[in-house]
Amino acid sequence: MERFDAIVVGAGAAGMFCAAQAGQLGCRVLLLDNGKKPGRKILMSGGGRCNFTNMYVEPAAYLSQNPHFCKSALARYTQWDFIELVGKYGIAWHEKTLGQLFCDDSAEQIVNLLLAECEKGGVQIRLRSEILSVERDEQGYRLQVNGETLVTKKLVIASGGLSMPGLGASPFGYKVAEQFGLKVLPTRAGLVPFTLHKPLLEQLQVLSGVSVPSTITAENGTLFRENLLFTHRGLSGPAVLQISSYWQPGEFVTVNLLPDCDLDDFLNEQRSAHPNQSLKNTLAMQLPKRLVECLQQLGQIPDVTLKQLNVRDQQTLVETLTAWRVQPNGTEGYRTAEVTLGGVDTNELSSRTMEARKAPGLYFIGEVMDVTGWLGGYNFQWAWSSAWACAQALVEVCSDNKVCTLLIKFVHKA
């Protein structure tokens, strides 16, 4: 039987960072993971370059039934703190768009950073570790792992959500929460492409691969202004991934395919200058040619010249292109989702320490809880911030134990 000050389950972004921070501040930490290598999701992120944070992180960019929960951790360990750490390791990075920060080279640099930080903290890492059971007694938490018994006063669950099951995602964290009486909110895929109903999908098949600037609005009024991508399964691209987290089955989304153009004014100006120009060629000045041709074949764009376009048809066209209402059939689900919405109810946890109120010594960090960020590095920042907050609490306990030990030795010596 082995004893540790803290055991962290899950060698992803949150788990590795928490273990490293606690280890460097004096805790004897064991990091467990069921995979063959640590940081698997990190390696896949950002097209292999890891969008490790965002310059514009703020609580408003996170979804949760308790929108105030994330404020404390995000304020205590900020994006600038992690950027400073990245700089210490000499990792070159760049801003891609909208404050999204990526490694110039490879996501492996972030994994190596985390492993180096763990090594500094003397963290033991054990991979391919299957946790058969978790029990709690007077000694703390007792884990059965690969035929061994491990005991710890502090157990940190950083096992993530259900997104990308091919990278080892599992409901382990939710099961542990429920075992100890914590409420787990319903989960669903977030930051995920939409699928379309068959008739519309068939009509739009020719557009697969076409990307356009857009604004996309959910029924609750949430709006994102980013690119939309037509795919052979439906709709994707940053705009769709963002809005998917705010969409509910059966709802419509409204798409503006010309967010940077006042179409009415543009058509009027072109009519004055080129009255005999075809409407199709005029629209192709603002939209991809394939999109214009598809819409014309579907009867959405009249086959007329500008001087033949009447007021009513122009108004209908403007509504079609700037307020296209789409009812998705669903999403591609956890297989391609970047995150999991829902999870451990944050009302069950301390926002300062991430500790479960009903189960002292049990902590939850990262994606496993009901905090989900926007696309663009926000979820990595939540991993760093929640992990850091938890690590400080673990260190407080470790320090208390060491102080007590020193006092006993001092009294005995006296």
Give residue spans per PLM region:
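Feature captures the FAD/FMN-dependent oxidoreductase FAD-binding
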Residues: 76-154
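Glycine-rich active-site loop/strand segments that organize a redox cofactor
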Residues: 49-94
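An anion/pyrophosphate-binding glycine-rich loop and adjacent beta-alpha core
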Residues: 36-38, 43-44, 52-59, 92, ...
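Glycine-rich loop(s) and the adjacent beta-strand/alpha-helix scaffold that form part
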Residues: 154-200
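Glycine-rich FAD pyrophosphate-binding loop
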Residues: 23-45
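Short hydrophobic core segments
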Residues: 7-9, 131, 150-163, 228-231
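A glycine-rich dinucleotide-binding beta-alpha-beta segment and adjacent secondary-structure elements
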Residues: 127, 297-372
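N-terminal Rossmann-like FAD-binding beta1-loop-alpha1 element of flavoenzymes
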Residues: 6-31, 394
